[in-house]
Regions:
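C-terminal or internal capping secondary-structure element at the end of a domain, subdomain, or sheet
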Residues: 128-160
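Contiguous, well-ordered beta-strand patches that form the walls/edges
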Residues: 12-17, 32-139
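Beta-rich carbohydrate-recognition modules and glycan-binding surfaces
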Residues: 1-25, 29, 94-101, 145-147, ...
Length: 214
């Protein structure tokens, strides 16, 4: 069920951190963050059927001070969290654990690892593997990782083929349901803004790196 391409659910509290799993008392993203951090919310986490894993970020992702960006902003992915190293994934259905093996491979946020949070001030080393607890319910995957002791990050992921995105249009924000299909397997069918609907068909085969960013 994990096989495929996933993205962060474009909604409030898709990313949150607190003293327990599923808790966002310390911080959680807002709806506005979905737009501000669009370079993060369009990142793909790809679980291939052959057991390989890919972080597909395109030209930009969200960078934090520990990665050299102060203040936080969109920027070019920084190694080793740029998908440049080969990685694999393994899912233990009995325990619900998902393990990524490969330097820099991650889900959600690269700074959250099992030993703690990566930082510019005395961070733990970047690990060769990271383990998350995954819960699958419908088309939603909820991931939890405890960073060190008592710090829990929770992420909500949805299949990349179907995502709800907040799209600026004029002076208003509309919630637009976007049915997204990889171009090399068929047409993209987009429902439109507010009462306007349209579809876009592209017959040119393209890879996931060349996907349309909304």
């Amino acid at each position: 069920a994990l096989t495929g391409s996933w993205v962060l659910a474009p909604e409030a509290a898709a990313l949150k951190v607190g003293p327990a799993a599923g808790n966002g008392d310390w911080w959680s993203n807002s709806e506005d963050d979905v737009t501000t951090r669009s370079c993060l919310f369009d990142d793909h986490y790809v679980f291939n059927a052959d057991g390989s894993f890919q972080n597909v970020q395109g030209d930009q992702t969200w960078l934090e001070p520990w990665q050299g960006s102060d203040p936080e902003a969109c920027g070019a992915p920084v190694a080793p969290h740029d998908g440049s190293n080969p990685a694999t994934w393994e899912y233990d259905a009995a325990s619900g654990e998902v393990t990524l093996t490969g330097l820099g491979a991650y889900l959600g946020l690269p700074k959250a690892v099992n030993a703690g949070e990566l930082s510019s001030d005395n961070p733990p080393p970047v690990p060769e593997s990271v383990t998350y607890t995954a819960t699958l319910e419908g088309d939603m995957m909820t991931l939890v990782i405890e960073c060190g002791t008592g710090v829990f990050w929770t992420y909500k992921l949805v299949p990349a083929q179907t995502a709800m995105v907040s799209t600026p249009f004029g002076n208003d924000d509309f919630r637009t349901l976007v049915e997204m299909m990889p171009r090399d397997s068929g047409p993209w069918d987009w429902s439109g803004y507010d009462s306007i609907s349209f579809s876009y068909n592209n017959t040119v085969a393209q890879s996931i790196e060349n996907r349309v960013h909304v």
